[in-house]
Design a protein with these regions (language model features):
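Short S/T/G/P-rich N-terminal loop/turn motif that feeds into the first structured element of a domain
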Residues: 1-76
Length: 76
């Protein structure tokens, strides 16, 4: 199993958390996360195989790639 973590700083992006929230579609392998105080937004994804494509609509709305994009193997 693979876990992927993607994080954006929205302070210097083209959008806000309020604009993003209605576009966040539920998914069994995706957990959306945010911190309004620090204007950060992201997602934690779990995959049985290679991670799938991230919704391009979200990247386009934010206007940049994530500042942090990490992939981890699940050990247990």
């Amino acid at each position: 199993m693979i876990v992927r973590l993607l994080l954006w700083n929205l302070a210097d992006s083209k959008t806000t958390l309020e604009e993003l929230r209605p576009r966040l579609e539920p998914s069994p392998n995706r957990t959306w996360i945010s911190d309004e105080t620090t204007e950060r937004f992201g997602v934690i994804e779990t995959w049985d195989d290679e991670p799938g494509d991230f919704p391009q609509e979200i990247v386009d709305l934010i206007g940049k790639e994530p500042e942090i994009a990490e992939r981890f193997d699940v050990e247990g």
